[in-house]
């Protein structure tokens, strides 16, 4: 005994439920995300089988979230879009004033140039990953003497200090960042130049 329900019907019900009920909550969270001074944004390709495009073509899931320093009030929003065009984050971030941490994708910098109230900051994880790839590509006997290895060590020192922030209040974090993290970041950028 059982009931056979076509998966397409179940998918359709899910879409209708989201459009009728969850979209109101999504819009509310989208407005609330503007209350934060620091956001993180990223986009990742997703394969789509329909929607008037070639089967298997790339579309994008854009993700916007509050920074991890807002421990008790995390908001993570996903936005499906058919392309990686700058118009998508431009529309999503139109009322946001603050710092948006990204992976360095040029679209974010294009938007930053259009606005005085938006700053784009680079993501340390993305920078670190590039240096790590370089170090791994080098022969083992040359790794520790490479500039990429030195960059990795400096980024690790920054991470070590940032990891201490997790249990602190926002005020304590700010003080700790100014006293320990900022000098490390300044030293890193002085070294890079």
Predicted segments, located by residue:
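Catalytic center-proximal scaffold of phosphoryl-transfer enzymes
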Residues: 1-193
